[in-house]
Amino acid sequence: VRRAAPAPEPRAGMLVCVCDPQLDAPANDNGPRAVSTFGLAVGFAFAVLAQTVASAALPLAGAQLAPRPELVTWPFAALLLGAALASFPASFLRDAFGRRTGFALGASVGIAGGALLVAALIQRQFAWACLGALWLGMAQGFSFFYRHEAAAASGRPAAATAGVLAGGLLAAVAGPTLASFAESLAAPFFLVGAAALAALAHTCSLGVAVMLADDPNSTFRPKVTAPLSAIVWPTLVAGIAWFGMNAVMSGAPLALVGCGIGGAAVFGFIALHVAAMYAPAVPLALAGDRLPPLAIALTGVVLVAIGVPLQRLATPESITAALICVGAGWSVATVGATAWIYQSGQPSRLALALHDGGLFALAICGALTGYLLA
């Protein structure tokens, strides 16, 4: 490294740059340890638990509180809107303050969102429910950066991404039992227990976030990043899967109720769907880097395309099959797209924010059309 020239004597109005352009911007929680995929997976698992119960509760809350039928899917759409809005701050706050602060902030917003949703259900306030769903979505948007954190820290981005997503499988399996128990404690207030469980799950996620390893200290290295154009095709391909999955997901609870399924039993169907979302990550964590990312992503899109028309058959069996297909397709497409954007090098924070923001924007469009499949 070239020795810097002696600094001149300070004078009034003199501007001094104290940052070496070859160094990463320091974060407030810098430290020497590397982050482990296991810690990221645990934090993501608690976020998935909150996502599971919120995804099942919000469509039913919309049906219960919406003043007009066309507004029924708005709380679920607000969940996705919050995730999209969080993409940019989640990406850039990581550099400004470090991973622990960023993930802790996201979990804190989720706690507030769950608490507000509890109040909305008790007071029967539709606007409050939408705002609570928005905050829960923001927490979800922050939590999806666990996969980027793992991919960036590993030389095997597909396997690392799948490893983090696999953490959601246990949360999905435990979700229905925990939701039923929470609902029994909150009886006779329908869905209040589920909303409180979402807030509690984010509280646990907050505890994990503050215990994550510090960010590594800044090191001297050339700034080599992938071009912004590298995210275009991965975002479009995965976005198709996100659109289809959320179109089915937002309409499924109401469709199941229309088939005679009880409201409490809907949590079991949604948990099966969420388990399908994260189960493919287990084999992909072992073999994902042996397969081309494009092939993985396209396989996910095909699975979603198979699942969407199944919901139109309007039977419990067909809706269940649709939920499984679109859940598995979403997982496979997301793993493939994440590995795809890392093929050209380390993506910039702007690229990651645009990628996740684009995915959630298409998910919102899918959620708003979900009532057509209900």
What would you call each of these model-derived segments?
Residues 45, 126-143, 318-332:
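Hydrophobic core of transmembrane alpha-helices in multi-pass small-molecule transporters
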Residues 58, 140-154, 332-345:
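Intracellular juxtamembrane helix-capping segments at the cytosolic ends
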Residues 132-166:
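Cytoplasmic helix-loop-helix junction between adjacent transmembrane helices
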Residues 179-181, 199-218:
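C-terminal membrane-cytosol helix-exit motif in multi-pass small-molecule transporters
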Residues 347-374:
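A late C-terminal transmembrane helix in Major Facilitator Superfamily
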